[in-house]
A protein has these predicted regions:
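Short acidic/polar capping segments at secondary-structure boundaries
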Residues: 29, 103-104, 113-114
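A generic structural motif
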Residues: 43-48, 104-110
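A short glycine-rich beta-strand->turn/loop micro-motif centered on a GG-aromatic cluster
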Residues: 95-103
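Regulatory modules associated with amino-acid/nitrogen control
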Residues: 1-95, 116-131
Length: 131
């Protein structure tokens, strides 16, 4: 698939903003209530709703993130989708944390930058729905 085809994905794209606020934490082991757990040979990272943190022990925390989920099928052959999204958000001064699963992609943005992120994605042609 050509990189230029991403314009079609932006124009027909849909994204959903979660109502929850998330924390990204570094832990020694997986969190039971986590949205996502990423393990590599150096660390374990959990993405978890802040309301579910409870007495969770962690080695580091970065909170106040909101999740934007791209509610669309993005084929593995698609080139440049995240480059376009991350580039536009970077140009708008929005830092991101991303997670991709087999069929769904998510971008986490700081709460105070959420409105800027939504407007930026809308300028790309996406329709955004807030939960």
């Amino acid at each position: 698939m050509k990189r230029s085809d991403i314009r079609t994905y932006f124009k027909n794209g849909r994204a959903v903003v979660s109502a929850e606020t998330y924390a990204i934490i570094k832990t020694k082991r997986a969190c039971a209530n986590a949205f996502a757990v990423i393990k590599d040979d150096r660390e374990t990272t959990c993405v978890i709703e802040e309301s579910r943190l409870g007495a969770q022990k962690y080695l580091g925390i970065e909170g106040d993130w909101r999740m934007i989920t791209f509610d669309m099928l993005l084929p593995f052959s698609l080139v440049g989708f995240f480059a376009g999204v991350s580039g536009a958000l970077a140009d708008a001064g929005v830092n991101i944390f991303t997670i991709s699963t087999y069929t769904t992609d998510h971008v986490f943005v700081k709460n105070q930058k959420l409105d800027i992120a939504v407007k930026t994605l809308e300028k790309l042609g996406m329709s955004i729905r807030r939960l």
